[in-house]
Protein backbone atom coordinates (compact mmCIF):
# COMPACT_ATOMS: atom_id res chain seq x y z
CA UNK A 1 0.00 0.00 0.00
CA UNK A 2 2.77 2.46 0.95
CA UNK A 3 4.80 1.59 -2.15
CA UNK A 4 1.73 2.09 -4.36
CA UNK A 5 1.07 5.49 -2.80
CA UNK A 6 4.69 6.54 -3.39
CA UNK A 7 4.64 5.28 -6.97
CA UNK A 8 1.41 7.18 -7.74
CA UNK A 9 2.84 10.43 -6.35
CA UNK A 10 6.08 10.06 -8.25
CA UNK A 11 4.34 9.14 -11.52
CA UNK A 12 2.07 12.19 -11.13
CA UNK A 13 5.17 14.36 -10.73
CA UNK A 14 6.79 12.86 -13.85
CA UNK A 15 3.80 11.88 -16.04
CA UNK A 16 5.74 11.52 -19.30
CA UNK A 17 8.62 9.51 -17.89
CA UNK A 18 9.37 5.94 -17.00
CA UNK A 19 10.31 5.73 -13.34
CA UNK A 20 12.23 3.41 -11.08
CA UNK A 21 12.09 3.53 -7.29
CA UNK A 22 14.53 2.43 -4.59
CA UNK A 23 13.11 2.87 -1.11
CA UNK A 24 14.46 2.74 2.41
CA UNK A 25 13.16 -0.16 4.50
CA UNK A 26 10.55 2.07 6.15
CA UNK A 27 9.53 3.75 2.84
CA UNK A 28 10.38 7.22 4.20
CA UNK A 29 13.19 7.93 1.72
CA UNK A 30 13.22 7.16 -1.99
CA UNK A 31 15.74 7.44 -4.80
CA UNK A 32 13.92 7.95 -8.10
CA UNK A 33 15.31 7.35 -11.57
CA UNK A 34 13.30 8.85 -14.41
CA UNK A 35 13.73 8.86 -18.17
CA UNK A 36 11.78 9.00 -21.43
CA UNK A 37 12.29 8.65 -25.15
CA UNK A 38 13.57 12.25 -25.30
CA UNK A 39 15.23 12.45 -21.89
CA UNK A 40 18.22 10.26 -20.94
CA UNK A 41 17.41 10.43 -17.29
CA UNK A 42 17.78 11.98 -13.89
CA UNK A 43 18.04 10.91 -10.28
CA UNK A 44 15.87 12.46 -7.58
CA UNK A 45 15.67 12.19 -3.82
CA UNK A 46 12.18 12.00 -2.31
CA UNK A 47 11.55 12.60 1.38
CA UNK A 48 8.09 11.07 1.70
CA UNK A 49 7.28 12.67 5.06
CA UNK A 50 8.13 16.17 3.78
CA UNK A 51 6.68 15.52 0.33
CA UNK A 52 9.75 17.08 -1.29
CA UNK A 53 11.33 15.70 -4.47
CA UNK A 54 14.79 17.12 -5.20
CA UNK A 55 16.77 16.55 -8.38
CA UNK A 56 20.18 15.10 -7.55
CA UNK A 57 21.55 14.53 -11.06
CA UNK A 58 20.48 15.24 -14.63
CA UNK A 59 22.39 12.88 -16.93
CA UNK A 60 22.36 15.23 -19.94
CA UNK A 61 21.32 18.80 -19.05
CA UNK A 62 22.69 20.10 -22.35
CA UNK A 63 19.95 18.27 -24.27
CA UNK A 64 17.19 20.48 -22.83
CA UNK A 65 17.90 23.11 -25.48
CA UNK A 66 17.24 20.67 -28.34
CA UNK A 67 14.00 19.41 -29.82
CA UNK A 68 14.19 15.62 -30.10
CA UNK A 69 12.11 13.07 -31.99
CA UNK A 70 9.15 11.16 -30.58
CA UNK A 71 9.46 7.39 -30.23
CA UNK A 72 6.20 5.69 -31.19
CA UNK A 73 5.56 2.08 -30.15
CA UNK A 74 3.62 -0.12 -32.58
CA UNK A 75 2.45 -3.70 -33.06
CA UNK A 76 2.33 -5.47 -36.39
CA UNK A 77 1.65 -8.84 -37.96
CA UNK A 78 4.47 -10.36 -40.00
CA UNK A 79 3.71 -11.97 -43.36
CA UNK A 80 3.42 -15.42 -41.73
CA UNK A 81 0.99 -14.23 -39.05
CA UNK A 82 3.44 -13.74 -36.17
CA UNK A 83 2.55 -10.78 -33.92
CA UNK A 84 5.56 -8.52 -33.26
CA UNK A 85 6.40 -5.10 -31.86
CA UNK A 86 8.63 -2.19 -32.72
CA UNK A 87 9.32 1.52 -32.43
CA UNK A 88 9.46 4.37 -34.91
CA UNK A 89 11.28 7.56 -34.02
CA UNK A 90 10.43 10.48 -36.26
CA UNK A 91 12.38 13.70 -36.77
CA UNK A 92 11.20 16.53 -34.51
CA UNK A 93 10.35 18.54 -37.65
CA UNK A 94 8.31 15.72 -39.24
CA UNK A 95 4.82 16.57 -40.52
CA UNK A 96 2.22 13.90 -41.39
CA UNK A 97 2.57 12.72 -44.97
CA UNK A 98 6.06 14.15 -45.40
CA UNK A 99 8.50 11.85 -47.22
CA UNK A 100 11.62 11.18 -45.17
CA UNK A 101 14.52 8.74 -45.42
CA UNK A 102 14.42 5.82 -42.99
CA UNK A 103 17.11 3.91 -41.14
CA UNK A 104 16.36 0.36 -40.04
CA UNK A 105 18.21 0.03 -36.73
CA UNK A 106 18.08 -3.62 -35.61
CA UNK A 107 19.17 -4.55 -32.11
CA UNK A 108 21.96 -7.05 -31.61
CA UNK A 109 21.35 -10.57 -30.64
CA UNK A 110 19.06 -12.25 -31.31
CA UNK A 111 19.34 -12.43 -27.51
CA UNK A 112 18.42 -8.76 -27.06
CA UNK A 113 15.44 -6.50 -27.64
CA UNK A 114 14.49 -2.90 -28.24
CA UNK A 115 12.46 -1.07 -25.64
CA UNK A 116 10.90 2.34 -25.18
CA UNK A 117 13.39 4.92 -24.02
CA UNK A 118 16.15 7.33 -24.90
CA UNK A 119 18.70 6.04 -27.41
CA UNK A 120 21.41 8.57 -28.30
CA UNK A 121 22.16 7.14 -31.75
CA UNK A 122 18.45 7.09 -32.64
CA UNK A 123 18.06 10.74 -31.63
CA UNK A 124 21.17 11.70 -33.62
CA UNK A 125 19.57 10.23 -36.75
CA UNK A 126 16.14 11.72 -36.01
CA UNK A 127 17.47 15.23 -35.43
CA UNK A 128 19.16 15.02 -38.81
CA UNK A 129 15.91 14.27 -40.61
CA UNK A 130 15.79 10.47 -40.60
CA UNK A 131 13.02 8.24 -39.39
CA UNK A 132 14.38 5.33 -37.36
CA UNK A 133 12.76 1.90 -37.22
CA UNK A 134 13.55 -0.52 -34.39
CA UNK A 135 11.91 -3.95 -34.54
CA UNK A 136 11.60 -6.75 -32.02
CA UNK A 137 11.80 -9.46 -34.66
CA UNK A 138 11.21 -13.11 -33.78
CA UNK A 139 13.87 -14.28 -31.37
CA UNK A 140 14.01 -10.99 -29.46
CA UNK A 141 14.12 -11.71 -25.73
CA UNK A 142 11.23 -11.06 -23.38
CA UNK A 143 8.41 -12.29 -25.62
CA UNK A 144 8.22 -15.92 -24.54
CA UNK A 145 9.75 -19.24 -25.49
CA UNK A 146 7.46 -19.78 -28.49
CA UNK A 147 8.58 -16.52 -30.14
CA UNK A 148 12.18 -17.46 -29.37
CA UNK A 149 11.72 -20.86 -31.05
CA UNK A 150 10.34 -19.17 -34.17
CA UNK A 151 13.82 -17.71 -34.74
CA UNK A 152 15.49 -21.13 -34.88
CA UNK A 153 17.43 -21.39 -38.15
CA UNK A 154 15.76 -18.19 -39.40
CA UNK A 155 18.76 -15.84 -39.54
CA UNK A 156 18.62 -14.04 -42.89
CA UNK A 157 15.22 -15.63 -43.50
CA UNK A 158 12.07 -14.95 -41.44
CA UNK A 159 13.95 -12.65 -39.05
CA UNK A 160 14.87 -10.38 -41.94
CA UNK A 161 11.36 -10.66 -43.35
CA UNK A 162 10.15 -9.28 -40.00
CA UNK A 163 12.31 -6.18 -40.51
CA UNK A 164 11.08 -5.69 -44.08
CA UNK A 165 7.43 -6.22 -43.07
CA UNK A 166 7.75 -3.67 -40.27
CA UNK A 167 9.36 -1.16 -42.64
CA UNK A 168 6.65 -1.59 -45.28
CA UNK A 169 3.86 -1.21 -42.73
CA UNK A 170 5.40 1.76 -40.98
CA UNK A 171 5.95 3.65 -44.23
CA UNK A 172 2.25 3.25 -45.02
CA UNK A 173 1.07 4.53 -41.64
CA UNK A 174 3.28 7.53 -40.87
What role is predicted for each listed range?
Residues 2-15:
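Short, non-transmembrane alpha-helical segments in secretory-pathway proteins
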Residues 8, 17-173:
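Serine-hydrolase catalytic core recognition
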Amino acid sequence: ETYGYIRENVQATFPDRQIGLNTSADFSKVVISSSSDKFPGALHYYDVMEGAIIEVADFAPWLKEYELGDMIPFNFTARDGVELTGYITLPPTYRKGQKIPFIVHPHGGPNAKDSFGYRPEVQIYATRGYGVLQVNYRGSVGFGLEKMKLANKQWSLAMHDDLLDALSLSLIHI
